Amino acid sequence: MPTTPDPGSEPPARTPRPPPLTPGLSPQPALHALSPQLLLLLFLAVSSLGSCSTGSPVPVPENDLVGIVGGHNAPPGKWPWQVSLRVYSYHWASWAHICGGSLIHPQWVLTAAHCIFWKDTDPSIYRIHAGDVYLYGGRGLLNVSRIIVHPNYVTAGLGADVALLQLEPHDLSNVRTVKLSPVSLELTPKDQCWVTGWGAIIRKESLPPPYRLQQASVQVLENAVCEQPYRNASGHTGDRQLILDDMLCAGSEGRDSCYGDSGGPLVCRLRGSWRLVGVVSWGYGCTLRDFPGVYTHVQIYVPWILQQVGELP
């Protein structure tokens, strides 16, 4: 990572801010359920440690930032809708990656609701990095003008883990939007699907320099297939489903999304084009046997997305 903040952006005016946590897959979605008050306390603790620092900013330790487990380097331009969601770290004096996202419209990004600290968050605390396979490339950052968190969101494990970020006008030419999957289109385990991101490459090992976007092919599974192992692991005996109807499961032996991939895309090749079918949400560890990653099922939220955004490309 470079030793200076990403160019083209100044730190937001209002302080303090929540810390650049890396919400992602965890043994249960407890991390995603942290209250805004607790996030604020965590941020104050981190900020106070660096409040006396002066001079040139130092690199953000990669363990604090964020990869795909079992993946490999993504070719430039293959996933042109992939973006990185950033918040400003006053401790490290740079914009730090917290989550992934997908460009679904030239001015709209779809991500996970748990990547947003609280529903009425000031959009100026976020930036979007787009159009580059390298997490800390030299491209400038895009400003966020509006945030819409799904009104039913409480925590990732309860569903509705989806949010929209509207971007200020920009002139990036090397990005492309991804199509949403039609509501009527059914997914099968035979569909060719890929997950991408800059998160951890194994559970306790972050993506190393030069922080190249990772990709991994995964298989979409029926919800009932992953419901039982999650139920067994949690000791849940009630009637409520753990893998809800607005979620889907995907994974393959040794390949999975992980910490720092949250909010990023799960795309499948459907009807001759790539379609966004899932948003990285939660899971039990990373690549643990019988525990595929859990994603927000984008098809369920297409009507809501269109209601907010209007016509898509």
Swiss-Prot record:
Start and end residues of each stretch annotated as Disordered: 1-27
Supply the alphabetized keyword list: Disulfide bond, Glycoprotein, Hydrolase, Protease, Secreted, Serine protease, Signal
Q: What is its EC number?
A: 3.4.21.-
Top-level division of the source organism's lineage: Eukaryota
Instruction: Write down the top EC class of this protein.
Output: hydrolase
Q: Where in the cell is it found?
A: Secreted
Which GO terms are recorded in the biological process aspect for this UniProt protein?
A: proteolysis
Q: Which residues are glycosylated?
A: 143
Occurrences of domain Peptidase S1 (ranges): 68-310
Q: Which GO terms describe its cellular component?
A: extracellular space
Residue stretches of biased makeup (Pro residues): 1-22
List all disulphide bridges recorded for this chain.
99-115, 193-268, 226-249, 258-286
GO MF entries? serine-type endopeptidase activity
Q: Catalytic site residues?
A: 114, 161, 262
Q: Which CDD domains match?
A: Tryp_SPc (cd00190)
Q: Which Gene3D superfamilies is this protein grouped with?
A: Trypsin-like serine proteases
Q: Name one matching Pfam family.
A: Trypsin
| Primary site of residence | secreted
SUPFAM superfamilies linked = Trypsin-like serine proteases (SSF50494)
Family, as annotated: Belongs to the peptidase S1 family.
Question: What protein name is recorded for this chain?
Answer: Putative serine protease 29
Q: Which organism is it from?
A: Homo sapiens (Human)
Lineage per the UniProt record: Eukaryota, Metazoa, Chordata, Craniata, Vertebrata
